[in-house]
Amino acid sequence: MQFRSIIRIVGLLLALFSVTMLAPALVALLYRDGAGVPFVTTFFVLLFCGAMCWFPNRRHKHELKSRDGFLIVVLFWTVLGSAGSLPFLIADNPNISVTDAFFESFSALTTTGATVIVGLDELPKAILFYRQFLQWFGGMGIIVLAVAILPVLGIGGMQLYRAEIPGPVKDTKMTPRIAETAKALWYIYLSLTIACAVAFWLAGMTPFDAISHSFSTIAIGGFSTHDASMGYFDSYAINLITVVFLLISACNFTLHFAAFASGGVHPKYYWKDPEFRAFIFIQVLLFLVCFLLLLKHHSYTSPYDAFDQALFQTVSISTTAGFTTTGFADWPLFLPVLLLFSSFIGGCAGSTGGGMKVIRILLLTLQGARELKRLVHPRAVYTIKVGGSALPQRVVDAVWGFFSAYALVFVVCMLGLIATGMDELSAFSAVAATLNNLGPGLGEVALHFGDVNDKAKWVLIVSMLFGRLEIFTLLILLTPTFWRS
């Protein structure tokens, strides 16, 4: 294990992360809200700590192995998540505890969107901007992690995807170097953010709200600058724009890369991808169920309102954004539970969405269908085909391994919450909301996590990390084998 090289890289990451504090400091200066001091202070603290880690080890540039890569990825999220809590700790408004500061920071960076802060409308603009910007920064990190780094380490949804499944993604000549891949993804991510911000502004948002919500929309984070979330704007146009950009962001970013690289975006190009087709099918099915049941129960006086709310909440929850326009927990009980379960599927591999990813659910479904056929014809040989090509058994085994680990982590976290005194419904939905990086839950955590006890919040922080790091990245560090030389 190249510890000095790892410390050098972490120091460099801290120094680079310190620069992100300048943006909210400028917002504080622009709006004169008096909230700039926490960010300037944090900038110098992180820059100093980063330099202290980097400078003594600057000449240690040994070749890193996969074990070093796992540790660096985990340290990226834990160190930056911890560093991101400093402005919340230093700021007078909001005046929150150490636990709440860490919870808010990790929730933002992992794009979970669960918040402990109430009274968002009264907060300084700089703090509001920082929460949104932290989600956007985390979203970019997620894309680079999922598309460029985890496949190199041999894990993650994209590893299965790019290795075995035919279609546009496998045929795409993604740049081989991580730095070049990250640069290409950065341009796409930034372009989508600008387009989203302009669309929100044209639909009636203020420039501040438009930029802030474009950050959390493209990152599929779900943070808002208002307690009422997207319901604050009460606009069909804004709801529709949010839906469109959430769907785009929940798609595999290598599909976007392939589309841009080919010189034009064509629907047929996306439709060749089996995961994309499955994703759209799931979205349409969920929307129809929600819309028809809302009509049946007369939840809204107008069918247009029912259509708007069903579409928005379906996409928002199932892609794990967690934006709300209405108290969806007050819908007929079946619907919020259905949408909560849909977050277990989440977005596509290589997207900013959370959950287990559509590609894994697709492979699990095909595996289940194969087992049913085997019961009828025990001696027959069946292969799982995706996009016309048969998948080797090791791919199916990898998916089942992930599913088993996911279930284990879920149960352990849920039992941990119940042990702290949380009721069963709230514990189940809180773990679902954090492990799937969704945000809002049901019961005690339907609106916010401010009333959750401190011990439970630390369990949920760990749950967020497990969800964002696709279980195995963090789980492997807990095995004795990893630390043996």
Swiss-Prot record:
Source taxon at top rank: Bacteria
Region (Selectivity filter part 2): 219-224
Binding site for K(+): 111-112, 220-221, 320-321, 437-438
Intramembrane region(s): 98-109, 110-115, 206, 207-218, 219-224, 235-250, 303-318, 319-324, 333-344, 345-357, 422-423, 424-434, 435-441, 454-465
Record topology, Periplasmic segments: 30-35, 116-124, 203-205, 225-234, 325-332, 420-421, 442-453
Segments of this protein annotated with the region Selectivity filter part 3: 319-324
Parts of the chain that traverse the membrane: 3-29, 36-57, 66-90, 125-150, 178-202, 276-296, 392-419
Keyword field: Cell inner membrane, Cell membrane, Ion channel, Ion transport, Membrane, Metal-binding, Potassium, Potassium transport, Transmembrane, Transmembrane helix, Transport
UniProt-annotated stretches for the region Selectivity filter part 4: 436-441
Cytoplasmic-facing ranges: 1-2, 58-65, 151-177
Topology with respect to the bilayer: Multi-pass membrane protein
Molecular function GO labels: identical protein binding; potassium channel activity; potassium ion binding; potassium:chloride symporter activity; protein homodimerization activity
Example GO BP: potassium ion transmembrane transport
Region (Selectivity filter part 1): 110-115
Subcellular location, record wording: Cell inner membrane
Recorded GO CC terms: plasma membrane
Subunit structure: Homodimer.
Similarity remark: Belongs to the TrkH potassium transport family.
Function recorded in the entry: Low-affinity potassium transport system. Interacts with trk system potassium uptake protein TrkA and requires TrkE for transport activity. Selective for permeation of potassium ion and rubidium ion over smaller ions such as natrium or litium.
Protein name, as recorded: Trk system potassium uptake protein TrkH
Organism of provenance: Vibrio parahaemolyticus serotype O3:K6 (strain RIMD 2210633)
